[in-house]
Amino acid sequence: MAYPFQLGFQDATSPIMEELLHFHDHTLMIVFLISSLVLYIISSMLTTKLTHTSTMDAQEVETIWTILPAIILILIALPSLRILYMMDEINNPSLTVKTMGHQWYWSYEYTDYEDLTFDSYMIPTSDLKPGELRLLEVDNRVVLPMEMTIRMLISSEDVLHSWAVPSLGLKTDAIPGRLNQTTLVASRPGLYYGQCSEICGSNHSFMPIVLELVPLKHFEEWSASML
């Protein structure tokens, strides 16, 4: 999860988030090299009074600065498209969970079970126990099995919301009348926090998301206790 004065991303908990972090580093390096080159050219132009007449009007230079940006864009686009298709691919999910956004709480339905549904509200600051996180704790956590493909179906009952868990690389809009889906695969157990990421009214900041990823055996015990 995030911590005070954090400058980087949260630690990746899913294969998709790991790919996104690698893509970020790849793109950042390209941007850094381009920025360094531009800064060098500007500095050299400002610090010298000489004019390079051979480069002011040259067919070779125009060819280079047309082809080189195209190559750079391809180097950025190819890994981006690969990750995009990975995020949209859902093959034989082990579990499906339907998430509905409300003003201002989330409701969850485990569609593979007969009657496993609950609402998830933020715990007020006055009711927090020692060690619990302000504005991030909920009364009912979403318990899910780790290392299994889980399909999340996301929609809304009223206005636009967005279901986001940064450490898993998830951010999917909850749109009234539309059912969006995303894939969730957690590589290790733990508590993972998120929040509504679409301004949805006066209590938008009070719609936290808490996922509790556990081994399959513990998930089966939890689901049996909830039925």
Curated annotation (Swiss-Prot):
It catalyses: 4 Fe(II)-[cytochrome c] + O2 + 8 H(+)(in) = 4 Fe(III)-[cytochrome c] + 2 H2O + 4 H(+)(out). Keywords: Copper, Electron transport, Magnesium, Membrane, Metal-binding, Mitochondrion, Mitochondrion inner membrane, Respiratory chain, Translocase, Transmembrane, Transmembrane helix, Transport. Its cofactor is Cu cation. Residues 46-59 are mitochondrial matrix. GO terms for molecular function: copper ion binding; cytochrome-c oxidase activity. It is found in: Mitochondrion inner membrane. The chain crosses the membrane at residues 15-45, 60-87. Residues 1-14, 88-227 are mitochondrial intermembrane. InterPro entries: CcO_II, CcO_II-like_C, CcO_II_C, Copper_CuA, Cupredoxin, Cyt_c_oxidase_su2, Cyt_c_oxidase_su2_TM_dom, Cyt_c_oxidase_su2_TM_sf. It comes from the Eukaryota. Mg(2+) binds at residue 198. Cu cation A2 binds at residues 196, 198, 200, 204. It is a multi-pass membrane protein. Cu cation A1 binds at residues 161, 196, 200, 207. GO terms for cellular component: mitochondrial inner membrane; respiratory chain complex IV. The keyword Transmembrane applies. Binds a dinuclear copper A center per subunit. The keyword Membrane applies. GO terms for biological process: ATP synthesis coupled electron transport. Its EC number is 7.1.1.9. Belongs to the cytochrome c oxidase subunit 2 family. PANTHER family: CYTOCHROME C OXIDASE SUBUNIT 2, CYTOCHROME C OXIDASE, SUBUNIT II. NCBIfam families: CoxB. Component of the cytochrome c oxidase, the last enzyme in the mitochondrial electron transport chain which drives oxidative phosphorylation. The respiratory chain contains 3 multisubunit complexes succinate dehydrogenase (complex II, CII), ubiquinol-cytochrome c oxidoreductase (cytochrome b-c1 complex, complex III, CIII) and cytochrome c oxidase (complex IV, CIV), that cooperate to transfer electrons derived from NADH and succinate to molecular oxygen, creating an electrochemical gradient over the inner membrane that drives transmembrane transport and the ATP synthase. Component of the cytochrome c oxidase (complex IV, CIV), a multisubunit enzyme composed of 14 subunits. The complex is composed of a catalytic core of 3 subunits MT-CO1, MT-CO2 and MT-CO3, encoded in the mitochondrial DNA, and 11 supernumerary subunits COX4I, COX5A, COX5B, COX6A, COX6B, COX6C, COX7A, COX7B, COX7C, COX8 and NDUFA4, which are encoded in the nuclear genome. This is Cytochrome c oxidase subunit 2. It comes from Equus caballus (Horse). The gene is MT-CO2.
